[in-house]
Amino acid sequence: IKQIIQLANTYKTPITFRAAGTSLSGQSSCDGVLVVIKFAFKKIKINKDANEITLGCGVVGIHANESLAFLKKKIGPDPATINSALIGGIINNNSSGMCCGTKDNSYKTLRSIRVILANGSMLDTSDALSVARFKDENKKLINELREIKEEINANKELKDLIIKKFKIKNTTGYSLNAFVDYDDEIDILAHLLIGSEGTLGFVSEVKLAVLDDLEFKACALLFFDNINNAANTIKEFAKVDFVSSAEIMDYASLKAASTYDELRDILADIKEGNTCVLIQSEHSNELKLDENINKIKEISKLAYKSYFSKNKAEYDLWWKIRKALLPIAASLRKAGSTVITEDVCFNIEDLADGIKSIQELFYKYGFGDNGIIFGHALAGNIHFIITPDLNNKLEFDNFSNLVKEMSNIVASYGGSIKAEHGTGRMVAPFVEVEWGKQAYL
């Protein structure tokens, strides 16, 4: 990699690092040299206290969890693509997922990082000698990081904006919260690299804190008459600490999922506007889990129909359907069309209005027959899928206008145009729309 970077500098050729390419936001497309890292950097090492794991950037996410399974541990980030996504992509996009939220993502669980910068400098933040050498060789960079931090600290409006923006999931632009959360320049740089999509350096290795994988789990499948009832219930779930995940699926998602034989009976009576929420709760003690289930039942009184299960085979099926919504939508699209998946985040109190705004855009721009909405509602994070024919000028223009209007709507709510999929080429033109000129510059 160091040689590739040296050659790229010599010949003034841009390079892009590609992990598994599961993000679909355009991070791994380029017109220069594409460096594919999935065949190398496979290091997995658990420390003796079993509270940290060192991972090479080429490790598949699920393999990290499989190596921790005998300890009943797991890594924090839990993207739906964890069976394919590589650690390099998970780290560089600050990918989160269904349970980790903002509390246990890559940024929050990072303990050390190993990186090569564009100038060839190498830094391993777990090695004091490497840190000292890096500081000595990169005084200008260290000073610039310090100056940016001082500039942010001196600007209350900007600092408050950064703090507010990162209370919810946000991968639009760089991790500016690093300048607020950390004082040491090396810590700032390490956390700036999270979510930087390879634009600041090549991250070859990370050390992450590991979490307990709680033994006892239960899930609930809750059906609501409309988005409002679902969103109001999710607001209540967000106030408690015993719900680890709440996945929302709109009517179009349920209609698509009804093609699965195993769910045909459960979904037989759904009507236009109905919404489903898949809940997960977990605990180290089964009796405590049972108590949590009863509390969930109390909170879920707005649901017109509900299913509860501690049977792994049963709730795994529910999760399988949730995770399969993207391939289901892909299989139902018309010939020649493209699967587009977007990823936004609203503050939890704006969730219902935000979802309705997206649905209105579907119909305004001609995607009402193929647009579906689902996502990690406990974090206010929703995904939507549309399938435009980008070779059709009208559909291309409609898609372009939808994305532009969506970006302005999400920004008007104080939300994130990209919550966990990374900025990529898709959202790069809209970073300033969300952040404003002051933060963007």
Language-model features: locations:
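Glycine-rich N-terminal segment of FAD-binding domains in flavoprotein oxidoreductases
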Residues: 1-41, 55, 75-76, 365, ...
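N-terminal glycine-rich flavin-associated loop
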Residues: 1-15, 37-79, 95-147, 212-225, ...
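A gly/ser-rich beta-alpha-beta helix-loop segment of oxidoreductase catalytic cores
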Residues: 24-25, 68-117, 161, 165-189, ...
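Amphipathic alpha-helical segments in well-structured domains
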Residues: 31-34, 293, 399-403, 439-440
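Phosphate/pyrophosphate- and phosphate-bearing ligand-binding catalytic cores of soluble enzymes
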Residues: 129-186
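C-terminal substrate-recognition/cap domain of FAD-linked oxidoreductases
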Residues: 178-186, 190-401, 407-409, 413-416, ...
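Activity-critical C-terminal alpha-helical subdomain
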Residues: 328, 332-335, 429-441
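Contiguous mid-protein beta-loop-alpha structural module that forms a pocket-lining wall or clamp
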Residues: 413-418, 424, 433-441
